Amino acid sequence: MGKVIGIDLGTTNSCVAVMEGTTPKVIENAEGARTTPSIVAFTDDGERLVGQPAKRQGVTNPERTFFAIKRLIGRTFEDPMTKKDIGLVPYKITKAPNGDAWVEADGKPYSPSQISAFILQKMKETAESYLGQPVSQAVITVPAYFNDAQRQATKDAGKIAGLEVLRIINEPTAAALAYGLDKKGSGTIAVYDLGGGTFDVSILEIGDGVFEVKSTNGDTFLGGEDFDTRLVEYLADEFKKENGIDLKKDKLALQRLKEAAEKAKIELSSATQTEINLPYITADATGPKHLALKLTRAKFEALVDDLIQKTVEPCRKALKDAGLSAGEVDEVVLVGGMTRMPKVQEIVKQFFGKEPHKGVNPDEVVAIGAAVQAGVLQGDVKDVLLLDVTPLSLGIETLGGVFTRLIDRNTTIPTKKSQVFSTAEDNQTAVTIRVFQGEREMAADNKLLGQFDLVGIPGAPRGVPQIEVTFDIDANGIVNVTAKDKATNKEQQIRIQASGGLSEADIDKMVKEAEQHAAEDKVRRELVDAKNHGEAIIHSTEKSLAEFGTKVAESDKSTIDAAIAALKTELAGENLEGIKAKTDALVQASMKLGEAMYKAGAEGGESAEAPKDDVIDADFKEVGPDDHKKSA
């Protein structure tokens, strides 16, 4: 069994870690960074970029650069949050045939699971490069408040990336695992997790290696992206007041504003004032326009105050569900990049009445926790038991469109609950069961996970047939349903097919595409390596020709010149085999040059030697240790 890795698939950044013995280790990517931007881009020639290279070209290629894709995962196109996102991002969000929200680049649609899979592939490659062996299994984190569709879509992303997802683990729970791994004694902790796109709060009891989640709450559409958006809107409004030009209509300018907003937000966590300078942001008939603005921390805090306040209510609900007061919480752990903001720390301190714990790296702690869970599953980490909860109530639609709860929110998972259903009409042979997740009283106001028909019920008067339906939520927080006709004891396993979601055929197709992309990437890498090698050979040959060209025959020199010209022509194209062949031809041709160099070197060496007959015998005497001492 190979290593199981832990991946924090974040909205803004992702991170991968692995257990080395009993110690978790965050792995640096190819660029030398410990986190990777969760960004995927497609260039003009169809090349796919992931991470920092994708982020770097985002300003000049906004319509094909996908960021914050996690906000769309597992959502339908009609979801109010999707509609909100459409107005915030420069790329195209489209409606998939199954009703889900997908994205599009150059007319080609991609599911959010697919885009996420490209990021997961990058994390997989990062781990493989470090470990020196293939990786096929992972633990992936999700926001605690993710529903079933979002969890399933994340699991699908892992599958598309070529990973068997052994466990989906909640981000605050992972953070608690990392925080409490070496802690002795017991206590109650609150994990306040404000990341790039989502907010979670979890209350846990920790003691003797047992991590028990008491409650969880959150908002899957609240995070750093919203803080950036507020700042972008402010900058655009200020610019419009001064210049009469609306930058929101210019995708290129908007992307530059977003980049500047993110940078300013980060700077204001340590500085009380920052300057935003964007020369040549746009132009009109009077010439180019520049954006230059001073921004104070106080102004930024005023712009986003309501967003920070939105995190307080979930904290209140989580405490209420756990049956605790703020004073009964022993420690508050901050997770997510946004918790570096002083105002956020101040609000947390006010609410919980204590200074939050800042001893963990908010960007890495979730991946570390995922690696710990991977270690538990692999048997490398002993005496750790994780008891998580389901964040949302699960139930069905009953007469009158009412939501009847079967499993309440904050129930410890895995869990199982059975309910007996019957028919509403005489001789009814089929019944439709609609499964929902949420907290509203009417089913239609909650998230429809899917529906299924029970068929083949023996004809009988209404209310007589007894069909036992069992709902079970596994350790990943994913729902499974079984149905049994109590009269015949015939059992049927039902996979909830959500109204949206990817089918097995969709996933298989995307897996094949990902494999094909990986093969294309390999060829592209080989081509770049071959070109670099060819150019290096040309450079060294031309340098040697300039130095030793006079030492080789004119015919050999002509052959070398011709080989260089042929390779240069080939390097302008994309033919890998042609480049390799022409490089080999130049290496062969330049062998004559090598011979001339060695010959010249040998001759130079001989002329430096004195004739044997002129060797002079020298007198010598032995030197004692004291003779080495020099007088000052």
Swiss-Prot record:
Residues modified as Phosphothreonine: 198
Keywords: ATP-binding, Chaperone, Nucleotide-binding, Phosphoprotein, Stress response
Chaperone keyword on record: yes
Pfam families named among the record's database cross-references: HSP70
Region Disordered, residue ranges: 601-632
Recorded GO MF terms: ATP binding; ATP-dependent protein folding chaperone; unfolded protein binding
Coiled-coil region: none
Induction: By stress conditions e.g. heat shock.
Domain of life from the UniProt record: Bacteria
Composition bias, Basic and acidic residues: 609-632
UniProt-listed InterPro entries: ATPase_NBD, Chaperone_DnaK, Heat_shock_70_CS, HSP70_C_sf, HSP70_peptide-bd_sf, Hsp_70_fam
UniProt-listed Gene3D superfamilies: 1.20.1270.10, 3.30.420.40, Actin, Chain A, domain 4, Substrate Binding Domain Of DNAk, Chain A, domain 1
Role played: Acts as a chaperone.
Similarity-based family: Belongs to the heat shock protein 70 family.
Name of the featured protein: Chaperone protein DnaK
The species this protein was found in: Beijerinckia indica subsp. indica (strain ATCC 9039 / DSM 1715 / NCIMB 8712)
Gene giving rise to this polypeptide: dnaK
